[in-house]
Protein backbone atom coordinates (compact mmCIF):
# COMPACT_ATOMS: atom_id res chain seq x y z
CA UNK A 1 0.00 0.00 0.00
CA UNK A 2 1.60 3.22 -1.21
CA UNK A 3 0.67 6.47 0.55
CA UNK A 4 1.06 9.78 -1.29
CA UNK A 5 0.19 13.36 -0.36
CA UNK A 6 -1.42 16.08 -2.46
CA UNK A 7 -2.89 19.56 -1.83
CA UNK A 8 -6.02 21.09 -3.35
CA UNK A 9 -8.55 23.89 -2.73
CA UNK A 10 -11.78 21.91 -2.90
CA UNK A 11 -12.68 18.24 -2.49
CA UNK A 12 -16.08 16.98 -3.64
CA UNK A 13 -17.03 13.54 -2.32
CA UNK A 14 -19.59 11.74 -4.48
CA UNK A 15 -20.18 11.87 -8.22
CA UNK A 16 -23.89 12.70 -8.15
CA UNK A 17 -25.97 15.75 -9.05
CA UNK A 18 -25.07 17.67 -5.88
CA UNK A 19 -21.27 17.52 -6.26
CA UNK A 20 -21.62 18.13 -10.01
CA UNK A 21 -23.74 21.23 -9.36
CA UNK A 22 -21.43 22.64 -6.68
CA UNK A 23 -18.36 21.99 -8.81
CA UNK A 24 -19.97 23.72 -11.80
CA UNK A 25 -20.94 26.76 -9.72
CA UNK A 26 -17.45 27.05 -8.22
CA UNK A 27 -15.77 26.83 -11.64
CA UNK A 28 -18.03 29.63 -12.92
CA UNK A 29 -17.49 31.83 -9.85
CA UNK A 30 -13.84 31.16 -9.06
CA UNK A 31 -12.21 29.31 -11.97
CA UNK A 32 -8.74 29.47 -10.41
CA UNK A 33 -9.65 27.06 -7.60
CA UNK A 34 -8.20 23.55 -7.86
CA UNK A 35 -10.97 20.97 -7.43
CA UNK A 36 -10.80 17.19 -6.96
CA UNK A 37 -13.90 14.95 -7.12
CA UNK A 38 -13.93 11.37 -5.79
CA UNK A 39 -16.51 8.74 -6.74
CA UNK A 40 -16.48 5.13 -5.53
CA UNK A 41 -18.20 3.75 -8.65
CA UNK A 42 -16.78 3.60 -12.18
CA UNK A 43 -18.86 6.49 -13.56
CA UNK A 44 -20.90 9.48 -12.34
CA UNK A 45 -24.59 9.66 -11.48
CA UNK A 46 -25.01 5.94 -10.90
CA UNK A 47 -26.35 5.86 -7.33
CA UNK A 48 -29.16 8.20 -6.14
CA UNK A 49 -28.96 10.32 -9.33
CA UNK A 50 -29.40 7.32 -11.64
CA UNK A 51 -32.54 7.57 -13.75
CA UNK A 52 -34.03 4.34 -12.33
CA UNK A 53 -33.14 5.22 -8.72
CA UNK A 54 -35.43 8.27 -8.44
CA UNK A 55 -38.80 9.32 -9.85
CA UNK A 56 -37.31 12.04 -12.08
CA UNK A 57 -39.96 14.56 -11.09
CA UNK A 58 -38.91 18.17 -11.49
CA UNK A 59 -40.42 18.96 -8.08
CA UNK A 60 -42.42 22.17 -8.45
CA UNK A 61 -45.43 21.43 -6.19
CA UNK A 62 -47.61 21.38 -9.31
CA UNK A 63 -48.87 17.90 -8.45
CA UNK A 64 -47.42 16.88 -5.06
CA UNK A 65 -50.25 17.27 -2.56
CA UNK A 66 -47.98 16.82 0.48
CA UNK A 67 -46.52 20.31 -0.15
CA UNK A 68 -49.85 21.95 0.70
CA UNK A 69 -51.36 21.49 4.16
CA UNK A 70 -55.08 21.61 4.81
CA UNK A 71 -56.19 23.48 7.92
CA UNK A 72 -59.05 22.39 10.15
CA UNK A 73 -61.13 25.23 8.72
CA UNK A 74 -60.64 23.90 5.17
CA UNK A 75 -58.06 26.52 4.20
CA UNK A 76 -54.91 25.41 2.36
CA UNK A 77 -51.43 26.64 3.28
CA UNK A 78 -49.41 27.03 0.04
CA UNK A 79 -46.22 28.45 1.63
CA UNK A 80 -44.16 25.29 1.13
CA UNK A 81 -45.51 24.79 -2.40
CA UNK A 82 -44.32 28.26 -3.41
CA UNK A 83 -40.90 27.63 -1.84
CA UNK A 84 -40.44 24.29 -3.64
CA UNK A 85 -41.47 25.86 -6.96
CA UNK A 86 -39.10 28.81 -6.46
CA UNK A 87 -36.23 26.38 -5.84
CA UNK A 88 -36.87 24.53 -9.09
CA UNK A 89 -37.08 27.82 -10.99
CA UNK A 90 -33.46 28.49 -9.92
CA UNK A 91 -32.37 25.07 -11.19
CA UNK A 92 -34.02 25.65 -14.57
CA UNK A 93 -32.45 29.10 -14.91
CA UNK A 94 -28.98 27.69 -14.19
CA UNK A 95 -29.39 24.85 -16.68
CA UNK A 96 -30.62 27.33 -19.31
CA UNK A 97 -27.52 29.47 -18.66
CA UNK A 98 -25.25 26.44 -19.14
CA UNK A 99 -26.98 25.62 -22.45
CA UNK A 100 -26.79 29.26 -23.62
CA UNK A 101 -23.07 29.48 -22.85
CA UNK A 102 -22.34 26.15 -24.53
CA UNK A 103 -21.12 24.44 -21.34
CA UNK A 104 -23.61 21.62 -21.86
CA UNK A 105 -25.85 20.81 -24.83
CA UNK A 106 -28.86 18.74 -25.95
CA UNK A 107 -31.32 19.62 -23.15
CA UNK A 108 -33.76 17.01 -24.49
CA UNK A 109 -31.33 14.36 -23.20
CA UNK A 110 -32.03 15.39 -19.59
CA UNK A 111 -35.31 17.37 -19.42
CA UNK A 112 -38.69 16.88 -21.08
CA UNK A 113 -42.04 18.61 -20.77
CA UNK A 114 -44.44 16.19 -19.08
CA UNK A 115 -47.73 17.49 -17.61
CA UNK A 116 -47.95 17.31 -13.82
CA UNK A 117 -51.33 16.23 -12.45
CA UNK A 118 -52.96 15.60 -9.07
CA UNK A 119 -55.61 12.89 -8.77
CA UNK A 120 -58.06 12.39 -5.90
CA UNK A 121 -61.15 10.28 -5.18
CA UNK A 122 -64.00 10.93 -2.75
CA UNK A 123 -66.01 14.06 -1.94
CA UNK A 124 -63.72 15.27 0.88
CA UNK A 125 -60.58 14.93 -1.22
CA UNK A 126 -62.24 16.63 -4.20
CA UNK A 127 -63.17 19.53 -1.93
CA UNK A 128 -59.55 19.75 -0.73
CA UNK A 129 -58.18 19.69 -4.29
CA UNK A 130 -60.54 22.47 -5.40
CA UNK A 131 -59.45 24.59 -2.43
CA UNK A 132 -55.78 23.87 -3.20
CA UNK A 133 -56.13 24.95 -6.83
CA UNK A 134 -58.10 28.08 -5.91
CA UNK A 135 -55.27 29.12 -3.57
CA UNK A 136 -52.45 28.26 -5.97
CA UNK A 137 -53.95 29.82 -9.10
CA UNK A 138 -53.69 33.28 -7.53
CA UNK A 139 -49.90 32.91 -7.69
CA UNK A 140 -48.09 33.51 -10.98
CA UNK A 141 -46.03 30.31 -10.59
CA UNK A 142 -49.21 28.24 -10.77
CA UNK A 143 -51.23 30.37 -13.21
CA UNK A 144 -51.52 27.60 -15.83
CA UNK A 145 -52.99 25.01 -13.46
CA UNK A 146 -56.39 23.62 -14.47
CA UNK A 147 -58.84 21.38 -12.61
CA UNK A 148 -61.68 19.23 -13.86
CA UNK A 149 -64.27 16.72 -12.72
CA UNK A 150 -65.66 16.32 -16.23
CA UNK A 151 -65.05 12.72 -17.44
CA UNK A 152 -64.65 13.87 -21.05
CA UNK A 153 -62.05 16.50 -20.19
CA UNK A 154 -60.16 14.08 -17.91
CA UNK A 155 -60.30 11.47 -20.68
CA UNK A 156 -58.62 13.93 -23.06
CA UNK A 157 -55.77 14.33 -20.55
CA UNK A 158 -55.32 10.75 -19.29
CA UNK A 159 -57.47 8.30 -21.30
CA UNK A 160 -55.98 5.18 -19.69
CA UNK A 161 -57.04 6.39 -16.26
CA UNK A 162 -60.67 6.62 -17.38
CA UNK A 163 -60.95 3.21 -19.06
CA UNK A 164 -63.11 0.93 -16.92
CA UNK A 165 -63.62 3.56 -14.23
CA UNK A 166 -66.99 3.51 -12.45
CA UNK A 167 -68.87 6.69 -13.25
CA UNK A 168 -70.48 7.02 -9.79
CA UNK A 169 -67.23 7.73 -7.88
CA UNK A 170 -66.33 11.37 -7.26
CA UNK A 171 -62.94 12.19 -8.77
CA UNK A 172 -61.03 15.34 -9.65
CA UNK A 173 -57.81 15.89 -11.54
CA UNK A 174 -55.56 18.91 -12.01
CA UNK A 175 -53.41 19.53 -15.08
CA UNK A 176 -50.35 21.73 -15.48
CA UNK A 177 -48.49 21.67 -18.78
CA UNK A 178 -45.37 23.30 -17.30
CA UNK A 179 -44.34 20.11 -15.47
CA UNK A 180 -41.12 18.27 -16.34
CA UNK A 181 -39.43 14.89 -16.22
CA UNK A 182 -35.72 15.17 -15.44
CA UNK A 183 -33.05 12.53 -15.99
CA UNK A 184 -30.68 13.61 -13.22
CA UNK A 185 -28.20 10.87 -14.12
CA UNK A 186 -27.83 12.19 -17.69
CA UNK A 187 -27.58 15.78 -16.41
CA UNK A 188 -24.89 14.76 -13.90
CA UNK A 189 -22.83 13.16 -16.66
CA UNK A 190 -23.06 16.36 -18.75
CA UNK A 191 -22.02 18.57 -15.82
CA UNK A 192 -19.07 16.37 -14.92
CA UNK A 193 -17.91 16.15 -18.56
CA UNK A 194 -17.87 19.97 -18.54
CA UNK A 195 -15.86 19.97 -15.29
CA UNK A 196 -13.31 17.60 -16.82
CA UNK A 197 -12.79 20.06 -19.68
CA UNK A 198 -12.07 22.74 -17.05
CA UNK A 199 -9.29 20.69 -15.46
CA UNK A 200 -11.24 19.45 -12.46
CA UNK A 201 -9.72 16.18 -11.24
CA UNK A 202 -12.42 13.53 -11.68
CA UNK A 203 -11.41 10.34 -9.88
CA UNK A 204 -13.60 7.24 -10.35
CA UNK A 205 -13.14 4.00 -8.39
CA UNK A 206 -11.77 6.10 -5.52
CA UNK A 207 -13.20 5.56 -2.03
CA UNK A 208 -12.87 8.07 0.80
CA UNK A 209 -11.72 6.20 3.91
CA UNK A 210 -11.33 9.04 6.42
CA UNK A 211 -11.68 12.81 6.90
CA UNK A 212 -9.61 14.53 9.62
CA UNK A 213 -9.18 18.14 10.69
CA UNK A 214 -5.55 19.32 10.59
CA UNK A 215 -3.95 21.79 13.01
CA UNK A 216 -3.64 24.38 10.22
CA UNK A 217 -7.44 24.41 9.72
CA UNK A 218 -7.40 22.37 6.51
CA UNK A 219 -8.82 18.87 6.07
CA UNK A 220 -6.96 15.66 5.40
CA UNK A 221 -9.01 13.33 3.21
CA UNK A 222 -7.72 9.77 2.96
CA UNK A 223 -8.62 8.22 -0.40
CA UNK A 224 -8.11 4.68 -1.70
CA UNK A 225 -7.73 3.95 -5.42
CA UNK A 226 -9.83 0.79 -5.77
CA UNK A 227 -8.00 -0.22 -8.97
CA UNK A 228 -4.47 -0.14 -7.52
CA UNK A 229 -5.13 -0.21 -3.73
CA UNK A 230 -2.90 2.87 -3.42
CA UNK A 231 -3.89 5.27 -0.63
CA UNK A 232 -3.57 9.05 -1.08
CA UNK A 233 -3.70 11.75 1.60
CA UNK A 234 -5.27 14.89 0.17
CA UNK A 235 -5.11 18.20 2.02
CA UNK A 236 -7.94 20.60 1.20
CA UNK A 237 -9.22 23.97 2.39
CA UNK A 238 -12.84 22.95 1.78
CA UNK A 239 -14.65 19.60 1.68
CA UNK A 240 -18.17 18.88 0.43
CA UNK A 241 -19.75 15.53 1.26
CA UNK A 242 -22.43 14.83 -1.35
CA UNK A 243 -22.38 11.06 -1.27
CA UNK A 244 -26.09 10.25 -0.94
CA UNK A 245 -26.67 7.68 1.77
CA UNK A 246 -22.92 7.53 2.48
CA UNK A 247 -22.89 11.19 3.54
CA UNK A 248 -23.88 10.38 7.14
CA UNK A 249 -21.07 7.85 7.83
CA UNK A 250 -18.54 10.21 6.20
CA UNK A 251 -19.83 13.17 8.21
CA UNK A 252 -19.44 11.10 11.38
CA UNK A 253 -15.75 10.54 10.53
CA UNK A 254 -15.13 14.32 10.65
CA UNK A 255 -16.05 14.38 14.37
CA UNK A 256 -17.29 18.00 14.07
CA UNK A 257 -19.80 18.90 16.76
CA UNK A 258 -22.50 19.39 14.11
CA UNK A 259 -22.22 15.67 13.26
CA UNK A 260 -23.36 14.61 16.74
CA UNK A 261 -26.90 13.51 17.62
CA UNK A 262 -27.78 12.78 13.99
CA UNK A 263 -28.87 9.37 12.77
CA UNK A 264 -30.21 7.92 9.57
CA UNK A 265 -32.94 5.44 8.68
CA UNK A 266 -32.65 3.77 5.25
CA UNK A 267 -35.75 3.20 3.14
CA UNK A 268 -35.69 1.31 -0.14
CA UNK A 269 -38.10 2.09 -2.96
CA UNK A 270 -39.84 -0.35 -5.29
CA UNK A 271 -41.73 0.60 -8.44
CA UNK A 272 -43.90 -1.21 -10.95
CA UNK A 273 -42.49 -0.68 -14.46
CA UNK A 274 -44.68 -1.18 -17.51
CA UNK A 275 -43.51 -3.68 -20.14
CA UNK A 276 -46.29 -3.05 -22.68
CA UNK A 277 -45.31 -0.38 -25.27
CA UNK A 278 -48.98 0.27 -26.17
CA UNK A 279 -49.80 1.16 -22.56
CA UNK A 280 -46.64 3.27 -22.20
CA UNK A 281 -47.43 5.38 -25.26
CA UNK A 282 -51.06 5.97 -24.32
CA UNK A 283 -50.15 7.81 -21.11
CA UNK A 284 -48.26 11.11 -20.99
CA UNK A 285 -48.23 12.67 -17.50
CA UNK A 286 -46.88 12.48 -13.98
CA UNK A 287 -49.97 11.86 -11.86
CA UNK A 288 -49.66 12.14 -8.07
CA UNK A 289 -52.29 10.84 -5.67
CA UNK A 290 -52.82 11.52 -1.98
CA UNK A 291 -51.07 9.60 0.79
CA UNK A 292 -53.26 7.72 3.24
CA UNK A 293 -53.89 9.34 6.61
CA UNK A 294 -50.92 8.69 8.91
CA UNK A 295 -48.65 7.53 6.08
CA UNK A 296 -45.27 9.29 5.64
CA UNK A 297 -44.76 11.77 2.75
CA UNK A 298 -42.56 9.27 0.89
CA UNK A 299 -45.64 7.05 0.43
CA UNK A 300 -47.49 9.37 -1.99
CA UNK A 301 -48.45 7.13 -4.95
CA UNK A 302 -47.70 8.38 -8.45
CA UNK A 303 -47.96 7.19 -12.05
CA UNK A 304 -44.96 8.54 -13.97
CA UNK A 305 -44.15 9.02 -17.60
CA UNK A 306 -40.35 8.84 -17.80
CA UNK A 307 -37.85 9.41 -20.59
CA UNK A 308 -34.76 7.21 -20.38
CA UNK A 309 -32.12 7.55 -23.11
CA UNK A 310 -34.76 8.90 -25.49
CA UNK A 311 -37.24 6.10 -24.79
CA UNK A 312 -40.57 6.60 -23.06
CA UNK A 313 -41.26 4.53 -19.93
CA UNK A 314 -44.07 4.26 -17.38
CA UNK A 315 -43.63 3.65 -13.64
CA UNK A 316 -45.98 3.38 -10.68
CA UNK A 317 -45.02 3.57 -7.02
CA UNK A 318 -43.30 3.90 -4.73
CA UNK A 319 -43.70 0.87 -2.54
CA UNK A 320 -41.38 0.82 0.43
CA UNK A 321 -38.81 -1.88 0.95
CA UNK A 322 -36.23 -2.24 3.67
CA UNK A 323 -32.50 -2.80 3.52
CA UNK A 324 -29.96 -1.78 6.18
CA UNK A 325 -27.75 -0.48 3.34
CA UNK A 326 -27.30 3.30 3.06
CA UNK A 327 -26.55 3.00 -0.67
CA UNK A 328 -27.81 0.58 -3.30
CA UNK A 329 -24.13 -0.37 -3.71
CA UNK A 330 -23.56 -0.18 0.04
CA UNK A 331 -22.99 -2.64 2.89
CA UNK A 332 -25.54 -4.53 5.00
CA UNK A 333 -23.65 -3.20 8.04
CA UNK A 334 -24.25 0.49 7.14
CA UNK A 335 -27.14 1.01 9.58
CA UNK A 336 -25.44 -0.79 12.49
CA UNK A 337 -22.14 1.04 11.96
CA UNK A 338 -23.92 4.42 11.91
CA UNK A 339 -25.10 3.99 15.52
CA UNK A 340 -22.66 5.83 17.80
CA UNK A 341 -22.70 6.68 21.53
CA UNK A 342 -23.69 10.28 20.64
CA UNK A 343 -26.72 9.31 18.50
CA UNK A 344 -27.95 6.11 20.16
CA UNK A 345 -30.63 7.88 22.23
CA UNK A 346 -31.57 9.94 19.17
CA UNK A 347 -32.14 6.75 17.14
CA UNK A 348 -33.99 4.93 19.94
CA UNK A 349 -36.25 7.95 20.55
CA UNK A 350 -37.21 7.98 16.87
CA UNK A 351 -37.92 4.25 16.98
CA UNK A 352 -40.36 4.73 19.87
CA UNK A 353 -42.09 7.77 18.35
CA UNK A 354 -42.33 6.77 14.70
CA UNK A 355 -44.89 3.99 15.14
CA UNK A 356 -46.79 5.08 12.02
CA UNK A 357 -43.65 4.74 9.90
CA UNK A 358 -42.89 1.30 11.36
CA UNK A 359 -46.48 0.19 10.75
CA UNK A 360 -46.33 1.54 7.17
CA UNK A 361 -43.04 -0.23 6.41
CA UNK A 362 -44.26 -3.56 7.82
CA UNK A 363 -47.46 -3.34 5.77
CA UNK A 364 -45.45 -2.48 2.63
CA UNK A 365 -43.01 -5.35 3.13
CA UNK A 366 -45.90 -7.79 3.35
CA UNK A 367 -47.50 -6.68 0.06
CA UNK A 368 -47.87 -9.33 -2.63
CA UNK A 369 -47.46 -8.47 -6.31
CA UNK A 370 -51.23 -8.81 -6.71
CA UNK A 371 -51.78 -6.22 -3.96
CA UNK A 372 -49.36 -3.82 -5.67
CA UNK A 373 -51.28 -4.21 -8.94
CA UNK A 374 -54.51 -3.51 -7.05
CA UNK A 375 -52.98 -0.23 -5.82
CA UNK A 376 -52.10 0.57 -9.43
CA UNK A 377 -55.72 -0.09 -10.45
CA UNK A 378 -56.80 2.93 -8.38
CA UNK A 379 -55.03 4.89 -11.15
CA UNK A 380 -55.45 2.47 -14.07
CA UNK A 381 -58.61 0.40 -13.48
CA UNK A 382 -57.83 -2.01 -16.33
CA UNK A 383 -54.15 -2.60 -15.53
CA UNK A 384 -53.06 -6.18 -16.32
CA UNK A 385 -50.62 -8.14 -14.15
CA UNK A 386 -48.60 -9.34 -17.13
CA UNK A 387 -47.87 -5.77 -18.31
CA UNK A 388 -45.91 -4.80 -15.19
CA UNK A 389 -42.69 -5.85 -13.41
CA UNK A 390 -41.22 -4.84 -10.03
CA UNK A 391 -37.94 -2.88 -10.05
CA UNK A 392 -35.85 -1.71 -7.09
CA UNK A 393 -35.12 2.02 -7.03
CA UNK A 394 -32.47 3.77 -4.95
CA UNK A 395 -31.87 3.83 -1.22
CA UNK A 396 -32.86 6.96 0.70
CA UNK A 397 -31.57 7.70 4.19
CA UNK A 398 -34.10 9.72 6.16
CA UNK A 399 -32.43 12.03 8.68
CA UNK A 400 -33.12 11.57 12.40
CA UNK A 401 -31.94 14.38 14.66
CA UNK A 402 -32.56 16.07 17.97
CA UNK A 403 -34.48 19.34 17.76
CA UNK A 404 -35.35 22.06 20.27
CA UNK A 405 -38.71 20.36 20.74
CA UNK A 406 -37.62 16.75 21.25
CA UNK A 407 -35.07 14.02 20.66
CA UNK A 408 -35.13 11.74 17.65
CA UNK A 409 -37.24 13.71 15.19
CA UNK A 410 -37.53 12.11 11.74
CA UNK A 411 -36.88 14.68 8.99
CA UNK A 412 -38.43 14.28 5.53
CA UNK A 413 -36.50 16.94 3.63
CA UNK A 414 -33.01 17.71 2.39
CA UNK A 415 -30.60 19.05 4.99
CA UNK A 416 -27.25 20.86 4.78
CA UNK A 417 -24.84 20.45 7.71
CA UNK A 418 -21.83 22.80 7.87
CA UNK A 419 -18.90 23.05 10.26
CA UNK A 420 -18.71 26.16 12.43
CA UNK A 421 -15.82 27.60 10.39
CA UNK A 422 -17.48 26.80 7.04
CA UNK A 423 -14.61 24.58 5.88
CA UNK A 424 -16.83 21.51 5.49
CA UNK A 425 -20.40 20.88 4.34
CA UNK A 426 -22.47 17.72 4.01
CA UNK A 427 -25.82 17.08 2.38
CA UNK A 428 -28.21 14.65 4.07
CA UNK A 429 -31.78 13.55 3.46
CA UNK A 430 -34.06 12.79 0.54
CA UNK A 431 -36.87 14.46 -1.44
CA UNK A 432 -37.11 17.02 -3.04
CA UNK A 433 -33.34 16.59 -3.36
CA UNK A 434 -32.03 16.82 -6.91
CA UNK A 435 -34.68 19.29 -8.12
CA UNK A 436 -33.45 21.82 -5.59
CA UNK A 437 -29.72 21.22 -6.20
CA UNK A 438 -28.92 24.76 -7.36
CA UNK A 439 -30.68 26.49 -4.45
CA UNK A 440 -29.11 24.09 -1.94
CA UNK A 441 -25.62 24.66 -3.37
CA UNK A 442 -26.15 28.44 -3.17
CA UNK A 443 -26.91 27.86 0.52
CA UNK A 444 -23.65 25.90 0.87
CA UNK A 445 -21.67 28.69 -0.84
CA UNK A 446 -23.23 31.40 1.33
CA UNK A 447 -22.44 29.49 4.51
CA UNK A 448 -18.95 28.30 3.53
CA UNK A 449 -17.60 31.22 1.47
CA UNK A 450 -19.01 34.14 3.46
CA UNK A 451 -16.18 36.58 2.67
CA UNK A 452 -16.23 35.86 -1.07
CA UNK A 453 -19.94 35.43 -1.71
CA UNK A 454 -20.81 39.14 -1.95
CA UNK A 455 -18.28 39.63 -4.75
CA UNK A 456 -19.77 36.64 -6.60
CA UNK A 457 -23.33 37.99 -6.66
CA UNK A 458 -23.09 39.85 -10.03
CA UNK A 459 -21.96 36.61 -11.72
CA UNK A 460 -24.62 34.63 -9.85
CA UNK A 461 -27.33 36.99 -11.15
CA UNK A 462 -25.97 36.58 -14.67
CA UNK A 463 -26.39 32.81 -14.30
CA UNK A 464 -29.62 32.86 -12.25
CA UNK A 465 -31.35 36.24 -12.81
CA UNK A 466 -33.91 35.84 -10.03
CA UNK A 467 -31.34 35.03 -7.32
CA UNK A 468 -32.22 36.84 -4.09
CA UNK A 469 -35.77 37.58 -5.25
CA UNK A 470 -39.03 35.67 -5.14
CA UNK A 471 -40.44 35.22 -8.63
CA UNK A 472 -43.84 34.67 -7.03
CA UNK A 473 -43.74 38.36 -6.04
CA UNK A 474 -42.39 39.65 -9.40
CA UNK A 475 -44.85 38.63 -12.09
CA UNK A 476 -43.25 40.49 -15.03
CA UNK A 477 -39.80 39.18 -14.14
CA UNK A 478 -41.14 35.63 -13.94
CA UNK A 479 -42.66 35.85 -17.42
CA UNK A 480 -39.50 37.40 -18.89
CA UNK A 481 -37.13 34.85 -17.32
CA UNK A 482 -39.44 31.96 -18.09
CA UNK A 483 -39.43 32.79 -21.81
CA UNK A 484 -35.62 32.47 -21.79
CA UNK A 485 -35.77 29.22 -19.85
CA UNK A 486 -38.34 27.76 -22.24
CA UNK A 487 -36.22 28.77 -25.25
CA UNK A 488 -32.99 27.16 -24.06
CA UNK A 489 -34.42 24.08 -22.33
CA UNK A 490 -37.14 23.55 -24.94
CA UNK A 491 -39.87 23.08 -22.32
CA UNK A 492 -43.35 24.56 -21.85
Swiss-Prot record:
Gene3D superfamilies in the record: D-Amino Acid Oxidase, subunit A, domain 2, FAD/NAD(P)-binding domain
Source superkingdom: Bacteria
Pathway this chain belongs to: Carbohydrate metabolism; tricarboxylic acid cycle; oxaloacetate from (S)-malate (quinone route): step 1/1
Record PANTHER family: L-2-HYDROXYGLUTARATE DEHYDROGENASE, MITOCHONDRIAL
Protein's GO biological process: tricarboxylic acid cycle
Gene: mqo1
HAMAP family: MQO (MF_00212)
EC number: 1.1.5.4
Catalysed reaction, written as an equation: (S)-malate + a quinone = a quinol + oxaloacetate
Classification via InterPro entries: FAD/NAD-bd_sf, MQO
Enzyme class: oxidoreductase
Ranges annotated as spanning the membrane: none
Cofactor(s) needed for function: FAD
Keywords from the named record: FAD, Flavoprotein, Oxidoreductase, Tricarboxylic acid cycle
GO MF: 2-hydroxyglutarate dehydrogenase activity; L-malate dehydrogenase (quinone) activity
Family: Belongs to the MQO family.
Species the sequence originates in: Staphylococcus epidermidis (strain ATCC 12228 / FDA PCI 1200)
The name this protein goes by in its record: Probable malate:quinone oxidoreductase 1
Amino acid sequence: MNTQHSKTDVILIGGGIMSATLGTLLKELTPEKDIQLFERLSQPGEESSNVWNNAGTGHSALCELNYTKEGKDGSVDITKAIHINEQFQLSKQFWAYLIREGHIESPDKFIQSVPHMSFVKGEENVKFLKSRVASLQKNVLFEKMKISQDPEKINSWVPLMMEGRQSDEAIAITYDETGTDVNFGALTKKLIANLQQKNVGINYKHEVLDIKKLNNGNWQVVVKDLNTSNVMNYESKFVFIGAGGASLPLLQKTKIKESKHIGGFPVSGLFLRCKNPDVIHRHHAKVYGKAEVGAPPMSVPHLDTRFVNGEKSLLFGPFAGFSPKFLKNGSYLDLVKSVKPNNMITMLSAGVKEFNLTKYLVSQLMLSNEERINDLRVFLPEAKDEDWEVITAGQRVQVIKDTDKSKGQLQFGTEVITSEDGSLAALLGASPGASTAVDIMFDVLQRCYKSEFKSWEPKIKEMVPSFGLKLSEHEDMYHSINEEVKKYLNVK
